[in-house]
């Protein structure tokens, strides 16, 4: 039977991708349905209880700048906050927070339940309604049919999910949750390129069975950093320490002696695991010269005794897991609350996606999250927001939008996925971005919030705060430009005390701030140079923009040169065999990828600058180049 109401957008899955997708579609005014197999697991952290990190924190800030949920959720549930790379330049600084799982999930559910235009419904989805290669809705486990103009699929590790603990394996999308077998089978009947990936999680430990006296405490930062541009430190719950222990030769001997019982090494698991989050057995074998590995002990929340030992993800049998855990300092009498496991699941080649996350084969169907071969909550959230936005635009009959590589890590993410694809779980790093000096955590709002407002993602509260910040920045920069000092000024001794070399000629406040030994706070402490801005976000921007002005301009000049043909459209039905001068290899790769633009085509492996020139000549010859391109 058909459900009585029709929807504009249906989102399947309630993880980090699904929740952001549903909220984005609803915020942009579309009647949205979120289908999940269990409403109680909305926003659940399936693996580590943390948000952010190098590259990942940048994505969270961008999601926030576009009105997304993740940053505010962690601000209200984070029990330890740190700035990584704090001593390095602003481009690679990153925020990371430990989360209270229960608080995080509760905050996410509360936001979802109170979002206008959003309906929640608990039922697993078994099939999609597709007519003439266009998605029309979804069918649930009990045969209930929902109609919609577009559908976003965010199935995580649930499609064909298989859990492994030693030689035992069973169907599951996550410990305690069933996998989506029927939906996986239905999707395999479609022309998608599908493969398997693997991820894993460590055993959870009862903190009451751990001796912390000999462990190294790892406190958070004080004052604590804030994730959301609307966040406040007062939102943070009680803060706690993490701890550090290490594996040792005994640990490694246990692992080596039991590799025949590892499903990964016995060939039972065929999916490729995450390179940057390997299992403990993988670390011991790949880094055989290391006699110890650092393990971070992370609390799972304020109201639970569970600990997450970050660094010993494993699929070894339970008895071996117990030996591994009890071989480490402080864990000699540890009690395992939940065993670790590996999970294999279906993923879809992301080269079959457009830059809007719409599939190339089925109109109106969008994919987001681990289904696209990524790993991590943050990568999932970023994809979810973009897929939800574009599903909304599709439902409205509007053109889709995605940021370029020089505009956001979100742009780097979809460009890497849709042009290069991936053979292993993809994780974001700052090193993946060519223009990372422009793509900092601190300026995510300056890069994206105005566009978010245009698209309908940014509400009045965020927009007012954004404009206030911009105004404060502009006024402060002008104020510093208007303050002058010379070697005969009364404050010259205060200035020279800060500078490495005495001031030799007249200089403005901005000139002084540009010098490496001067920071904003020391500058405004000089008589006549204060008072300091109360808006710390604005003052941080003033300092960064002044100090890095030359480098920033250089990157902008590089971008301007590279963008000349970046957005030149390539017809979807272009027959590359008819383009004279292209090699057979290039024809095959372009025909397979069907790139949307010249820019995307240029980043496909094996596509040479000469091939791009030939394409441009072909487009011009056939009147497909717009004036000025």
UniProtKB/Swiss-Prot annotation:
Keyword annotations from UniProtKB, A to Z: Cytoplasm, FAD, Flavoprotein, NAD, tRNA processing
Pfam families: GIDA, GIDA_C_1st, SAM_GIDA_C
InterPro entries: FAD/NAD-bd_sf, GIDA_C_N, MnmG, MnmG-rel, MnmG-rel_CS, MnmG_C, MnmG_C_subdom, MnmG_C_subdom_sf
Annotated compartments: Cytoplasm
Taxonomic superkingdom: Bacteria
Cofactor(s) needed for function: FAD
Binding sites annotated in the UniProt record for NAD(+): 273-287
Biological processes, Gene Ontology terms: tRNA methylation; tRNA wobble uridine modification
Residues the entry annotates as binding FAD: 13-18, 125, 180, 370
GO molecular function: flavin adenine dinucleotide binding
CC annotations in GO: cytosol
Family the entry assigns: Belongs to the MnmG family.
Reported function: NAD-binding protein involved in the addition of a carboxymethylaminomethyl (cmnm) group at the wobble position (U34) of certain tRNAs, forming tRNA-cmnm(5)s(2)U34.
Subunit-structure text: Homodimer. Heterotetramer of two MnmE and two MnmG subunits.
Record-given protein name: tRNA uridine 5-carboxymethylaminomethyl modification enzyme MnmG
Organism: Aliivibrio fischeri (strain ATCC 700601 / ES114)
Name of the encoding gene: mnmG
